[in-house]
Amino acid sequence: MKTLWRWLGRALLAAFALLLLWQVWLFAQVAWWRTHNPDSTSFMRLRLDALQEKKPDARLRHTWVPYEQISIHLKRAVVAAEDDGFVDHEGFDWDGIQRALEKNERKGRPVSGGSTISQQLAKNLFLSPSRSYFRKAQEAVITVMIEQLWSKRRILEVYLNVVEWGNGIFGAEAAARRYYGLPASRLGPAEAARLAVMLPNPRKYERSFGPRLAAHADRIRGRMAWAEVPP
């Protein structure tokens, strides 16, 4: 019996050591990306694998552009649509989380996550789309790392360059060229609002952008003037 407990203790210690090493690696990666642009993300690689299962030579559409080459209208539209308290919170919008929980309870199923831009970025960079308590806890840890090490400008820059905007389409530049034939720097308020409202389900909305979504884009456009973004 003592041998069993000894082996169990060693197994737990080894698991803890591996978890700690994983956190150290994550921290080092976040620190590196403070000044270096990520070539891809965990989610981008998952999507590429899925596309290549059907078409082996499939490629993602993705072109990195610096923050100053992204339209101010798109920055404001995304913040207005996804995280209107972005510049003020430290990674978590507790009021938004509470509203999401209440909405999910009314619907009887998860329909709203209440995730901030920082949380979405943490998930996209490192994690899978699966839902579990461990994944949410890890997302929270990475969110804290990002918020502590990066400026809000850097967070929004990376987010706008790696977020999904359609099937195989990632980042503002690829989205602007795919849907409007423009560089991201030249997007106007209307185009920006329409791109912003696609973010919750981009692969669905690129195929079906109906009147309901168009009305939502109009509402976002009306809120853009008050959306605060990093300079």
Swiss-Prot record:
Q: What compartments host this protein?
A: Cell inner membrane
Please state what class of enzyme this protein is.
transferase
> Reaction(s) catalyzed by this protein?
[GlcNAc-(1->4)-Mur2Ac(oyl-L-Ala-gamma-D-Glu-L-Lys-D-Ala-D-Ala)](n)-di-trans,octa-cis-undecaprenyl diphosphate + beta-D-GlcNAc-(1->4)-Mur2Ac(oyl-L-Ala-gamma-D-Glu-L-Lys-D-Ala-D-Ala)-di-trans,octa-cis-undecaprenyl diphosphate = [GlcNAc-(1->4)-Mur2Ac(oyl-L-Ala-gamma-D-Glu-L-Lys-D-Ala-D-Ala)](n+1)-di-trans,octa-cis-undecaprenyl diphosphate + di-trans,octa-cis-undecaprenyl diphosphate + H(+)
Arranged from A to Z, the UniProt key words for this protein are: Cell inner membrane, Cell membrane, Cell shape, Cell wall biogenesis/degradation, Glycosyltransferase, Membrane, Peptidoglycan synthesis, Transferase, Transmembrane, Transmembrane helix
Q: Which GO terms describe its molecular function?
A: pentosyltransferase activity; peptidoglycan glycosyltransferase activity
Q: How does it sit in the membrane?
A: Single-pass membrane protein
Q: What are the EC numbers?
A: 2.4.99.28
Keyword Cell wall biogenesis/degradation present in the record's keywords: the answer is yes
* Task of the protein: Peptidoglycan polymerase that catalyzes glycan chain elongation from lipid-linked precursors.
Name of the protein described by the UniProt record: Biosynthetic peptidoglycan transglycosylase
Source organism per entry reads: Azoarcus sp. (strain BH72)
Q: What is the lineage of its organism?
A: Bacteria, Pseudomonadati, Pseudomonadota, Betaproteobacteria, Rhodocyclales
Q: What's the encoding gene here?
A: mtgA
